[in-house]
Regions:
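Structural preference for solvent-exposed beta-strand-turn elements
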Residues: 1-205
Length: 205
Protein backbone atom coordinates (compact mmCIF):
# COMPACT_ATOMS: atom_id res chain seq x y z
CA UNK A 1 0.00 0.00 0.00
CA UNK A 2 1.45 3.42 -0.88
CA UNK A 3 2.38 5.79 1.90
CA UNK A 4 -0.26 8.35 2.90
CA UNK A 5 -0.04 11.66 1.09
CA UNK A 6 -0.20 14.57 3.52
CA UNK A 7 -2.47 17.40 2.39
CA UNK A 8 -1.77 20.86 3.70
CA UNK A 9 -4.80 23.10 4.26
CA UNK A 10 -4.93 26.17 2.07
CA UNK A 11 -4.08 29.42 3.84
CA UNK A 12 -6.96 31.24 2.15
CA UNK A 13 -10.01 30.57 0.02
CA UNK A 14 -9.47 30.10 -3.70
CA UNK A 15 -11.64 31.31 -6.55
CA UNK A 16 -10.71 29.14 -9.52
CA UNK A 17 -12.42 27.16 -12.25
CA UNK A 18 -11.21 23.62 -12.83
CA UNK A 19 -11.71 21.62 -16.02
CA UNK A 20 -12.06 17.96 -15.08
CA UNK A 21 -11.16 15.30 -17.66
CA UNK A 22 -13.98 13.42 -19.31
CA UNK A 23 -14.73 9.73 -18.93
CA UNK A 24 -13.72 7.09 -21.49
CA UNK A 25 -16.66 4.91 -20.53
CA UNK A 26 -19.23 7.71 -20.67
CA UNK A 27 -17.80 9.12 -23.91
CA UNK A 28 -18.13 5.79 -25.72
CA UNK A 29 -21.68 5.33 -24.45
CA UNK A 30 -22.55 8.83 -25.63
CA UNK A 31 -21.03 8.16 -29.06
CA UNK A 32 -23.26 5.11 -29.56
CA UNK A 33 -26.35 7.05 -28.49
CA UNK A 34 -25.37 9.94 -30.77
CA UNK A 35 -25.07 7.57 -33.74
CA UNK A 36 -28.50 6.11 -32.94
CA UNK A 37 -30.11 9.54 -32.62
CA UNK A 38 -31.73 11.40 -35.51
CA UNK A 39 -29.66 14.42 -36.54
CA UNK A 40 -26.60 16.06 -35.06
CA UNK A 41 -25.53 15.48 -31.47
CA UNK A 42 -22.87 17.68 -29.90
CA UNK A 43 -20.82 16.17 -27.08
CA UNK A 44 -18.90 18.46 -24.74
CA UNK A 45 -16.27 17.41 -22.23
CA UNK A 46 -15.49 14.26 -24.22
CA UNK A 47 -12.37 12.31 -23.35
CA UNK A 48 -10.01 11.60 -26.24
CA UNK A 49 -8.27 8.33 -25.43
CA UNK A 50 -7.23 5.23 -27.37
CA UNK A 51 -10.63 3.62 -26.70
CA UNK A 52 -12.69 6.63 -27.76
CA UNK A 53 -10.58 7.11 -30.89
CA UNK A 54 -11.23 3.45 -31.75
CA UNK A 55 -14.97 4.04 -31.34
CA UNK A 56 -14.84 7.16 -33.52
CA UNK A 57 -12.87 5.32 -36.21
CA UNK A 58 -15.41 2.48 -36.16
CA UNK A 59 -18.36 4.85 -36.56
CA UNK A 60 -16.63 6.54 -39.49
CA UNK A 61 -15.90 3.12 -41.01
CA UNK A 62 -19.64 2.45 -40.79
CA UNK A 63 -20.42 5.65 -42.69
CA UNK A 64 -21.26 8.05 -39.86
CA UNK A 65 -20.08 11.65 -40.13
CA UNK A 66 -18.13 12.88 -37.11
CA UNK A 67 -16.23 16.06 -36.28
CA UNK A 68 -13.72 16.02 -33.43
CA UNK A 69 -11.96 18.94 -31.75
CA UNK A 70 -9.56 17.64 -29.14
CA UNK A 71 -8.53 21.15 -28.08
CA UNK A 72 -12.07 21.93 -26.90
CA UNK A 73 -13.02 18.31 -26.01
CA UNK A 74 -15.98 18.44 -28.38
CA UNK A 75 -17.36 15.84 -30.76
CA UNK A 76 -20.22 16.16 -33.24
CA UNK A 77 -21.90 13.03 -34.59
CA UNK A 78 -24.54 13.03 -37.31
CA UNK A 79 -26.92 10.27 -36.27
CA UNK A 80 -29.08 8.30 -38.67
CA UNK A 81 -32.11 7.58 -36.50
CA UNK A 82 -31.21 3.97 -35.78
CA UNK A 83 -29.92 3.26 -39.29
CA UNK A 84 -26.34 2.15 -40.02
CA UNK A 85 -25.18 3.65 -43.35
CA UNK A 86 -22.93 0.79 -44.47
CA UNK A 87 -24.02 -2.83 -44.64
CA UNK A 88 -20.49 -4.21 -44.75
CA UNK A 89 -17.37 -3.19 -42.85
CA UNK A 90 -14.26 -4.49 -41.14
CA UNK A 91 -13.96 -3.11 -37.63
CA UNK A 92 -10.82 -3.24 -35.47
CA UNK A 93 -11.73 -2.74 -31.80
CA UNK A 94 -8.15 -2.95 -30.55
CA UNK A 95 -8.32 -3.64 -26.82
CA UNK A 96 -11.31 -1.35 -26.22
CA UNK A 97 -13.87 -3.38 -24.28
CA UNK A 98 -16.59 -0.74 -24.51
CA UNK A 99 -16.18 -0.43 -28.27
CA UNK A 100 -16.10 -4.22 -28.70
CA UNK A 101 -19.33 -4.88 -26.82
CA UNK A 102 -21.30 -1.75 -27.63
CA UNK A 103 -20.60 -2.02 -31.36
CA UNK A 104 -21.55 -5.71 -31.46
CA UNK A 105 -25.08 -5.04 -30.17
CA UNK A 106 -25.30 -1.84 -32.22
CA UNK A 107 -24.45 -3.66 -35.47
CA UNK A 108 -27.09 -6.31 -34.81
CA UNK A 109 -29.74 -3.62 -35.44
CA UNK A 110 -28.95 -3.53 -39.16
CA UNK A 111 -30.87 -6.44 -40.69
CA UNK A 112 -28.80 -7.92 -43.50
CA UNK A 113 -25.54 -6.28 -42.48
CA UNK A 114 -22.35 -8.35 -42.50
CA UNK A 115 -19.47 -7.13 -40.34
CA UNK A 116 -16.06 -8.59 -39.57
CA UNK A 117 -14.80 -7.64 -36.10
CA UNK A 118 -11.37 -8.25 -34.65
CA UNK A 119 -9.18 -6.92 -31.88
CA UNK A 120 -5.63 -7.17 -30.62
CA UNK A 121 -4.15 -10.23 -28.93
CA UNK A 122 -5.46 -9.24 -25.50
CA UNK A 123 -8.98 -8.60 -26.81
CA UNK A 124 -9.08 -12.07 -28.36
CA UNK A 125 -8.86 -13.46 -24.82
CA UNK A 126 -11.62 -11.32 -23.31
CA UNK A 127 -15.11 -12.78 -22.68
CA UNK A 128 -17.80 -12.15 -25.30
CA UNK A 129 -20.01 -15.21 -24.80
CA UNK A 130 -22.64 -13.53 -22.61
CA UNK A 131 -23.40 -10.82 -25.16
CA UNK A 132 -23.20 -13.07 -28.20
CA UNK A 133 -25.48 -15.68 -26.64
CA UNK A 134 -28.03 -13.00 -25.77
CA UNK A 135 -28.04 -11.67 -29.33
CA UNK A 136 -28.46 -15.17 -30.75
CA UNK A 137 -31.29 -15.92 -28.30
CA UNK A 138 -33.02 -12.72 -29.43
CA UNK A 139 -32.59 -13.80 -33.08
CA UNK A 140 -30.68 -10.56 -33.61
CA UNK A 141 -27.52 -12.00 -35.17
CA UNK A 142 -25.57 -15.09 -36.14
CA UNK A 143 -21.82 -15.37 -35.66
CA UNK A 144 -19.05 -17.16 -37.52
CA UNK A 145 -15.89 -17.48 -35.44
CA UNK A 146 -12.46 -17.42 -37.04
CA UNK A 147 -10.65 -18.62 -33.93
CA UNK A 148 -11.86 -19.73 -30.52
CA UNK A 149 -15.67 -19.90 -30.17
CA UNK A 150 -17.29 -16.80 -28.62
CA UNK A 151 -14.10 -14.77 -29.05
CA UNK A 152 -12.70 -12.34 -31.59
CA UNK A 153 -12.26 -12.45 -34.52
CA UNK A 154 -15.73 -13.18 -35.85
CA UNK A 155 -18.15 -12.26 -38.60
CA UNK A 156 -21.49 -10.86 -37.46
CA UNK A 157 -24.48 -11.49 -39.69
CA UNK A 158 -27.09 -9.05 -38.46
CA UNK A 159 -30.72 -10.13 -38.46
CA UNK A 160 -32.18 -7.01 -36.90
CA UNK A 161 -32.17 -6.56 -33.12
CA UNK A 162 -35.93 -6.39 -32.61
CA UNK A 163 -35.89 -6.74 -28.83
CA UNK A 164 -37.75 -9.23 -26.70
CA UNK A 165 -37.03 -11.01 -23.46
CA UNK A 166 -33.57 -12.28 -22.62
CA UNK A 167 -31.55 -13.31 -19.59
CA UNK A 168 -28.20 -11.61 -19.14
CA UNK A 169 -25.41 -12.74 -16.86
CA UNK A 170 -23.39 -9.57 -16.48
CA UNK A 171 -20.91 -10.99 -13.97
CA UNK A 172 -18.16 -11.27 -16.57
CA UNK A 173 -18.64 -7.65 -17.61
CA UNK A 174 -21.29 -5.00 -16.98
CA UNK A 175 -20.63 -3.86 -20.55
CA UNK A 176 -22.72 -6.81 -21.76
CA UNK A 177 -25.85 -5.37 -20.19
CA UNK A 178 -24.90 -1.83 -21.24
CA UNK A 179 -24.49 -2.94 -24.86
CA UNK A 180 -28.03 -4.36 -25.01
CA UNK A 181 -29.55 -1.40 -23.19
CA UNK A 182 -27.86 1.17 -25.45
CA UNK A 183 -29.27 -0.45 -28.59
CA UNK A 184 -32.71 -1.28 -27.15
CA UNK A 185 -34.38 2.11 -27.85
CA UNK A 186 -34.15 1.31 -31.58
CA UNK A 187 -35.75 -2.13 -31.28
CA UNK A 188 -39.37 -2.66 -32.29
CA UNK A 189 -40.32 -4.78 -29.27
CA UNK A 190 -38.12 -3.26 -26.61
CA UNK A 191 -36.02 -5.42 -24.29
CA UNK A 192 -36.67 -6.82 -20.86
CA UNK A 193 -34.21 -7.84 -18.19
CA UNK A 194 -34.81 -11.03 -16.23
CA UNK A 195 -34.09 -10.67 -12.53
CA UNK A 196 -34.05 -7.76 -10.15
CA UNK A 197 -33.90 -4.08 -11.03
CA UNK A 198 -30.73 -2.69 -12.58
CA UNK A 199 -28.73 -0.75 -10.03
CA UNK A 200 -26.74 2.21 -11.30
CA UNK A 201 -23.95 3.15 -8.92
CA UNK A 202 -22.59 6.69 -9.04
CA UNK A 203 -19.28 6.92 -7.17
CA UNK A 204 -18.81 9.80 -4.79
CA UNK A 205 -16.66 12.58 -6.20
Amino acid sequence: MPAPLPIQPLPRALDHTLSLPGSKSITNRALILAALADGETHLEGALFSRDTRIMLAALEQLGFETISDEATARITVKGQGGRIPRNNARIDVGNAGTAARFLTAFLALNDGGVYHLDGDAAMRLRPMAGLLESLVSLDAADFKFHGDPAHFPFTLNAKGYKGGKTTVDAKASSQILSALLLASPCTTKGSRQAGGPIKLICPEV
